[in-house]
Amino acid sequence: MPEPITQHGIKIAGENPMIILYRPGSDDIVVLVSMWTARYSPVGSGRALLIWADPDESGLGSDAPIGMYADNPELAEYVWEHFYRDYDRIRGRGIETGPPVPARFVEVSGGDRFHRISCVAATTTIELEWRDVLDYFQVTTRLTGFETSAVAGPCAAAEVRVNGVAARGEIHQPEGWFGSSAALAFAEIWREI
């Protein structure tokens, strides 16, 4: 007899790669990026970039982005309210203080060599690049009332460029369950438990 099918309420499905750059030789974060691509969410599909960069330490000065960029503003607000409520590493940096900035996104993949997402807003272009995928594996976590599963791809290198200028900073390896502070996350699903 076949096993019964169990259905669970899905809160979001898509991708969520991240980049965290540190001041060289330290644990001080200088750039923090969380890039969401929702194929499904209760507020529709789209992309939302949550980003914080220290103006001085990143070397980006007055161009250092802090905030949310989105092609679906409701998605950016939904992601912030539902998935970052207990994530101290990103909270308190001012990301949520302004409304989401309207933006367009372009994605290019070079297999295991690189993955690039460009975010273009009125006066700002933010380019995110993950390079040299080290491995792919499935990870399942239970954080903040959700079960999350994803296909993770920790990377050996990453770069964040704003208006053509590369942010200073280095990734950490190993770090967390992804093994790198620059990691791709495909087929990511969050369900409430």
What are these language model-derived features?
Residues 1-193:
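Targeting-peptide/extracellular-domain and disordered-appendage signature
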